Amino acid sequence: MELHILFFILAGLLIAVLISFSLWSARREKSRIFSNTFSTRPPSTPINNIVSDVPPSLNPQSYAQTTGQHGETEADNPVQIQQEVESSLREIKINLPGQDSAAYQSKVEETPIYSGQPVLPVQPQYQTQVQYQTQPQHIEPAFTQAPQSPIAEATSVLEQSVEELERQAAQGDVDIYSDASVRVELAKNSMQADSVAEQKPVAENNMLTLYVVAPEGQQFRGDYVVQSLEALGFQYGEYQIFHRHQHMGNSASPVIFSVANMMQPGIFDLTKIEHFSTVGLVLFMHLPSEGNDVVNFKLLLKTTENLAQALGGFVLNEHREIFDENSRQSYLARVS
């Protein structure tokens, strides 16, 4: 009888241990599979300090802009401008009745041109020769002023020569029916051309830019980025970035907008995409675009919002601020 009681007690203890172990194992597996990791993450806030922009190498107009800058640099060469001014001054000719034009041309070529320093007047060999250069007797050096640039000095000399020609024509020393007035007008046009060359062209902002950034302290994985872009109709192509063509699936159709990596150099290396991660993406559209700009912008905005939702990021405007209704109206005003 005592053995039966002892057996029942041991069986009950064994059953209790098995039940306890089963409950503990089930709870541990449940916590491992269904653990809520969002409670341990920091608050999701957009990245405030973003200094990245569209890489210059990805802009199709970068080559043209670089070529334009080289052209401006060559145009601003002081030596070249000085030579052009001297050539313009040598073209100023005043022919008097009865004077040999060849002898007068040789005198003009022998006459020195101002190069920033005053020169002594040349003694005339003929009584009828006209001194068209400015007399420097009244020029006093101003030591308190800063030295002028070669462009300013050459322009000043040209203005003095033009004023001297006009004064002599008004006094009757030069035949007013000759081609002197025409050459004076030529000198004025040369000065206007030099002043226009000094002006820098203002580049217009002809590109719409939107950003998709990850929450603070997080990054987008490369395989997720590529999968999301392909699902939205992007195709990997030129410049090693993704493009959205006018006709989805047809890479021969024109590109409407593109997406690049926000981090330099801005490309997507598909051979190393499993090790790739980024803090954000930049979507840009050149204006004017192929087709209707308003329709293309709405497609760009909708695609950007879907991409941000798929990756769990935020949409920012070109000023790296949260894209709101005011930003939407501002962008629509630019494409309208």
Swiss-Prot record:
Record field: compositional bias (Polar residues): 59-70
Ranges for region Disordered: 56-77
A single BP term in Gene Ontology: division septum assembly
Main subcellular location of this protein, as a coarse class: membrane
Residue stretches spanning the membrane: 3-23
Cytoplasmic side: 24-336
Protein localization: Cell inner membrane
Function statement: Essential cell division protein that stabilizes the FtsZ protofilaments by cross-linking them and that serves as a cytoplasmic membrane anchor for the Z ring. Also required for the recruitment to the septal ring of downstream cell division proteins.
Quaternary structure and partners: Interacts with FtsZ via their C-terminal domains.
Protein family (similarity comment): Belongs to the ZipA family.
Protein name: Cell division protein ZipA
Organism: Actinobacillus pleuropneumoniae serotype 3 (strain JL03)
Lineage, highest ranks first: Bacteria, Pseudomonadati, Pseudomonadota, Gammaproteobacteria, Pasteurellales
